[in-house]
Amino acid sequence: MTKIMHIADLHFGREDERLVEALAEKEQELRPDVVVASGDLTTFGRRREFAAARELFDRFDAPVVASPGNHDVPYANMFSRLVSPWRRFRRRMGDTITGSYADDDVAIESLETSRGAQWRLDWSLGKARPDQAREIAGRLESNSPQGQLKVVVCHHPLVAPGGMTGRAKTRFGEEAADIFIRGGAHLVLTGHMHQVFALSERHGDHVCWFVSASTAFSIRTRDEPAGFNLLTAEEDHFVMDIYVANEEGGFKQYERRHLTRKEAEIVPEHPGEPGI
């Protein structure tokens, strides 16, 4: 039974300090096997913002698998943004994070969907590389023993509730999603939208869930409060516990969903009063 703590869009530099502390406490309390961070650890890609992210992750007992987001490129240094957009991310985070992880029960790989620059006006939107997606799917398929959970983490959504429009307009996102579905991935964990959702796609008898988390603790909330997801893998389903920020500066479980691994459906369960 694997437990994954899924966080996204931390946006250090625009963080609620009370929620930073609360998240560290929740990691200790919930004791996940691994923490997955779906990008945007920082707001402007500044060194002090990366230092704050590293300080938080150093407090976690669980290993952290992270993929960079569009806010993790140097905002003010155009040369670095164009030539080496992720050098600061990798150098400043160091061995605090990893791009892949595997144990007897789960294998996790990261897909880079953020770009330092693009041939379109909105550089914040995502772009997946189908060739990288095929490489990742191949590694997961060839290196994963029977029964091992296969997980992909990236920043931008590959599928979205309203379709691939607006902020969800990830180039080649649907192609990458199809590659992962056919390659046997069980979970694709994303961020960027500051929105919680779980959508399923299937290939034959195989079901893949695309799960998005809200912003973990940024003051840059949109239509939903800050929060995170805890995903627990059971034999025939995933238990998705959604935590949201409350007025006291902590996190409270808001909803539990059962994501079936044999049929593409969600069975909701409300454990108590909302924490918002």
What are these regions (language model features)?
Residues 20-21, 49-53, 129-130, 166-175:
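Charged helix-capping and loop-helix junction motifs
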Residues 1-59, 75-76:
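N-terminal active-site segment of His-dependent metallophosphoesterases
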Residues 162-236:
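Conserved beta-sheet core of the metallophosphoesterase superfamily
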Residues 6-8, 35-40, 64-70, 112, ...:
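Active-site neighborhood of phospho(di)ester-bond hydrolases with catalytic His/Asp-centered motifs
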Residues 51-135, 179-181, 206, 230:
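Extended active-site neighborhood of metal-dependent phosphoesterases/phosphodiesterases
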Residues 1-5, 100-110, 141, 145-149, ...:
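Beta-strand-turn-beta hairpins that frame and shape the catalytic cleft
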Residues 13-15, 43-48, 70-78, 115-121, ...:
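Active-site environment of divalent metal-dependent phosphoester hydrolases
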